[in-house]
């Protein structure tokens, strides 16, 4: 699923007014977030709605309706953002990847696993997460370090993709893990991967956008929440994510470009989480926060 941006181009003052309208209509959505930014090359302002959803047409019509009163003269433009081609990215590289105690390998590399390593077998396929991307590797490394420092009795992997992080958490911690994704193909692939890795109980899969499912209250609150999604949805869902975190719990966030980390930290500091550690991998950051 690609990230789509619907936006209007205007002056700074008018962009701020448009942003107010956008924020009001998308306040309750998990998958759409409104923001404004300057395009320095053209010296114009853009008020945008970013989303990862199949419901672009419905978002567009709600937006058009809301802008029709005061801003109908501003055309709604559209951009497909290139940095979320998860499936193409999951096909990058096939050699085993090592992070923390984990080695993620394809079925052709079973003999490369060394004694003492926690092996996870994932073949590149229809969902993101072979371990090659800096965000996945960062989460694996952070997971190993959090497990050394804090007791974890259950975990949530939000945006599970191939299921790699959920399987890693289960193999490392031996605790119940809930794994969810907005994309039903991902949850099916993740469940298949779990079976291939010998995980038959203790790992639950569900398809849900953000926290919109009763499965979170049934299985939570969680001592550990891992969310490798994207900076904007992570900021948007900060209040719900923290509401599902157990007292003393840990959060691992990734999918964040280095330059976006301050905004993400500010959103979670605003929910009373404290920064514990940041890891950098290929321009991406993975952040550990605690309650
Ligand atoms: C970068 S991939 C991460 C996959 C895997 N967890 C990993 O670390 O390699 C992000 C995943 O989050 C899912 N996703 C995006 N927005 C979501 C949302 N609002 N709620 C749940 N899942 C979401 C995508 O479908 C995708 O599978």
Swiss-Prot record:
Keywords associated with the record: Cytoplasm, Methyltransferase, S-adenosyl-L-methionine, Transferase
UniProt EC number: 2.1.1.-
Catalysis performed (reactions): L-lysyl-[protein] + 3 S-adenosyl-L-methionine = N(6),N(6),N(6)-trimethyl-L-lysyl-[protein] + 3 S-adenosyl-L-homocysteine + 3 H(+)
GO cellular component: cytoplasm
One MF annotation (Gene Ontology) recorded for this entry: protein-lysine N-methyltransferase activity
UniProt keyword annotation of Cytoplasm present: yes
SUPFAM superfamilies in the cross-refs: S-adenosyl-L-methionine-dependent methyltransferases
Primary residence: cytoplasm
Membrane spanning residue stretches: none
Binding-site positions, S-adenosyl-L-methionine: 136, 159, 181, 228
Any one GO biological process: methylation
Annotated localization: Cytoplasm
Role this protein plays: Methylates ribosomal protein L11.
PANTHER family registered for this protein in UniProt: ELECTRON TRANSFER FLAVOPROTEIN BETA SUBUNIT LYSINE METHYLTRANSFERASE
Name of the protein described by the UniProt record: Ribosomal protein L11 methyltransferase
Species of the source: Rhizobium meliloti (strain 1021) (Ensifer meliloti)
Taxonomic placement: Bacteria, Pseudomonadati, Pseudomonadota, Alphaproteobacteria, Hyphomicrobiales
């Amino acid at each position: 699923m690609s990230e789509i941006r619907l936006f209007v181009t205007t002056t700074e003052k008018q962009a701020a007014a448009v942003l107010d309208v956008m924020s009001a209509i998308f306040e309750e959505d998990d998958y759409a977030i409104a923001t404004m930014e300057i395009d320095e090359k053209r010296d114009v302002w853009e008020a945008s709605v970013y989303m990862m959803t199949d419901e672009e047409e419905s978002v567009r019509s709600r937006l058009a309706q809301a802008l029709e009163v005061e801003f109908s003269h501003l055309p709604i433009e559209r951009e497909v953002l290139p940095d979320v081609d998860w499936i193409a990215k999951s096909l990058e590289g096939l050699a085993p990847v090592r992070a923390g105690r984990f080695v993620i390998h394809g079925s052709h590399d079973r003999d490369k696993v060394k004694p003492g390593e926690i092996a996870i077998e994932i073949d590149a396929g229809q969902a993101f997460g072979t371990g090659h991307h800096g965000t996945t590797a960062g989460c694996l490394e952070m997971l190993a370090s959090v497990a050394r420092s804090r007791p974890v009795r259950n975990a949530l992997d939000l945006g599970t993709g191939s299921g790699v992080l959920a399987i890693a958490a289960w193999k490392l911690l031996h605790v119940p893990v809930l794994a969810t994704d907005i994309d039903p193909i991902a949850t099916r692939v993740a469940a298949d991967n779990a079976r291939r890795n010998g995980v038959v109980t203790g790992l639950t899969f569900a398809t849900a956008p953000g926290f919109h499912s009763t499965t979170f209250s049934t299985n939570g609150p969680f001592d550990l929440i891992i969310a490798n999604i994207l900076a904007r949805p992570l900021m948007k869902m900060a209040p719900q994510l923290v509401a599902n975190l157990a007292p003393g719990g840990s959060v691992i966030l990734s999918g964040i470009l280095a330059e976006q980390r301050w905004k993400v930290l500010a959103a979670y500091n605003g929910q009373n989480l404290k920064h514990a550690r940041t890891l950098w991998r290929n321009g991406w950051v993975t952040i550990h926060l605690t309650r």
